[in-house]
Amino acid sequence: MAKKSMIAKNKRPAKYSTQAYTRCEKCGRPHSVYRKFKLCRVCFRELAYKGQIPGVVKASW
């Protein structure tokens, strides 16, 4: 879990466009964030297993 100060800092607009970085909307994790869903891989997997992300199904072949 990210510190509250880091989450608040991320919500502010960056001074320069290169300073902006993605953070998970649910837990605030800065690494391995899927831009399309704005979730980290851990949160994405949890929500996908629960069926809370529409259109996402477990792959089987």
UniProtKB/Swiss-Prot annotation:
InterPro entries the record matches: Ribosomal_uS14, Ribosomal_uS14_bact, Ribosomal_uS14_CS, Ribosomal_uS14_sf
Organism whose genome encodes this protein: Streptococcus equi subsp. zooepidemicus (strain MGCS10565)
Keyword presence, GTP-binding: no
Gene3D superfamilies listed in its UniProt record: 30s Ribosomal Protein S14, Chain N
Keywords from the UniProt entry: Metal-binding, Ribonucleoprotein, Ribosomal protein, RNA-binding, rRNA-binding, Zinc
Keyword Transport (UniProt): no
Cofactor binding note: Binds 1 zinc ion per subunit.
Reported cofactor(s): Zn(2+)
Any one GO molecular-function label of the UniProt entry: zinc ion binding
Official protein name in the record: Small ribosomal subunit protein uS14B
Superkingdom of this protein's organism: Bacteria
Binding-site residues, Zn(2+): 24, 27, 40, 43
Biological process terms in GO annotation: translation
Function: Binds 16S rRNA, required for the assembly of 30S particles and may also be responsible for determining the conformation of the 16S rRNA at the A site.
Sequence similarity: Belongs to the universal ribosomal protein uS14 family. Zinc-binding uS14 subfamily.
The protein's assembly and partners: Part of the 30S ribosomal subunit. Contacts proteins S3 and S10.
Cellular compartments per GO CC: small ribosomal subunit
